[in-house]
């Protein structure tokens, strides 16, 4: 069901593209277009479902998902501004049909900011899978609408690292168990934030430092957005 939904969504996203942008393509900075053909759907699956899983796994400590997610939204707003202004950024495709995303991104930012008020440590409410998966899928979908998937991946670098830590831990454990009979671990615990908890870091320190890193990743994404 998940795969069918992504295929339909990717097809609909492709329909929104202006006629001067090749169908089923990936933009790689400075107006470079890479046609993907059938692999566009595979790529869409990784972007949308990968984003959903990244935010879902990131939502493991009080306030962390909101603090890591908001900088990414701000990068997408800048990408949207560039996509709706001719000549503002040579690295962004001109997409006059996506200006309605301002309202959607603003609503998402406001919702996440409001949620943080109640989810800050000690949290009084929790998002759960429904909220975290939806935020990740939304992030990936907006990035695809803006042809800014790579920029989004860089901005969400901290969440990507958290996702990869969980994937690496699982795969390494399974492989070593199959080879040696005893599963081994790369991290003390996965995902990454639990590894640092095992090292004795406080929850507040982990969230704040990951937040700083998220800002740095988003800053790098803005640099790439302007000059790459």
Question: What is each of the regions a protein language model found here?
Answer:
Residues 1-161:
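"…together with the soluble PPM/PP2C metallo-phosphatase catalytic core" -> "…together
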Residues 13-14, 79, 148-150, 167-169, ...:
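Surface-exposed beta-strand edges and their flanking turn/coil or helix-capping segments
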Residues 17-21, 220-228:
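Juxtamembrane boundary at the C-terminal end of a transmembrane helix
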Residues 158-209:
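Membrane-proximal soluble regions of multi-pass membrane proteins
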Residues 205-225:
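Final/C-terminal transmembrane alpha-helix of multipass membrane proteins
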């Amino acid at each position: 069901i998940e795969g069918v939904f992504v295929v339909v969504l990717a097809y609909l996203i492709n329909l929104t593209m202006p006629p001067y942008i090749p169908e089923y393509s990936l933009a790689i900075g400075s107006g470079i277009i890479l046609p993907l053909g059938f692999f566009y759907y595979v790529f869409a699956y990784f972007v949308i479902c990968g984003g959903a899983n990244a935010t879902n796994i990131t939502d493991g400590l009080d306030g962390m998902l909101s603090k890591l997610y908001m900088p990414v939204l701000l990068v997408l707003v800048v990408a949207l501004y560039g996509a709706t202004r001719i000549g503002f950024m040579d690295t962004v495709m001109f997409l006059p049909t996506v200006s309605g995303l301002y309202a959607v991104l603003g609503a998402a930012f406001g919702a996440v900011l409001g949620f943080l008020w109640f989810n800050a440590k000690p949290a009084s409410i929790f998002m759960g899978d429904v909220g975290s998966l939806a935020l990740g899928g939304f992030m990936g979908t907006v990035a695809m609408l803006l042809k800014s998937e790579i920029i989004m991946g860089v901005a969400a670098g901290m969440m990507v690292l958290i996702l990869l830590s969980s994937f690496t831990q699982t795969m390494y454990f399974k492989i070593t168990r199959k080879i040696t009979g005893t599963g081994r671990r790369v991290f003390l615990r996965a995902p990454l934030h639990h590894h640092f908890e095992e090292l004795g870091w406080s929850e507040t320190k982990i969230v704040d430092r990951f937040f700083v890193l998220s800002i740095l990743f988003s800053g790098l994404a803005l640099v790439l957005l302007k000059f790459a």
